[in-house]
Amino acid sequence: MLKFNIFRIPVTVHPMFWVFMFLFVAIFAGENATALGITLKVLAFFLSILIHELGHALVARRYGAPVRIDLHGIGGQASYLLPNSTKKKTIIITAAGPLLQLGVAFIALFILAPLAQGTLAAGFIAPFVWISILLAVFNLLPVYPMDGGQILYEALPYNKKKIAFIVGVIVSALGIFVGLIYGQIFLAIFAGLGAWGNYQRLKQG
């Protein structure tokens, strides 16, 4: 288990994170993939997800919350207990993850990538950019508990919270359809889990 601090925030990377990341990348890498290429993509996923959770954690700490980051499975989580929580604070903290992820991706794309052309670093920067953009945009979809779904949930009036789960079911259903049409089984399965989770929350009221 890897443990370290970044900006005085404790980070724990669980062993299964690496297992799932290597399996995920290897499955979609293609027959011409090399061990080095797969490793660079796994490290790109690691840095991108860490930056995402760091966005949440830094803003939460700015509001006075003790924070920590855990990377596990195929994702991560910034844990915090926010004192004097408000809708505005929660929305800002939630949005900070994908926004920081996008910001760093565009810096890498327009500043670092041109400098790294023809070097080994280019094999890391290129996947880091598209991974970060895809993950950030994906996380902003209005499907609870992803960031977009959480933002929608917090933005709605108390008596309209169910709308967030209805939207989540609809968007997830579209994801299932797109996944099946284009043969993206992983997308269809993930969207199916999202649809089921939001349906269960809708039933619970």
Language-model-detected regions and their locations in the chain:
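Hydrophobic transmembrane alpha-helices and their immediate loop junctions
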Residues: 1-205
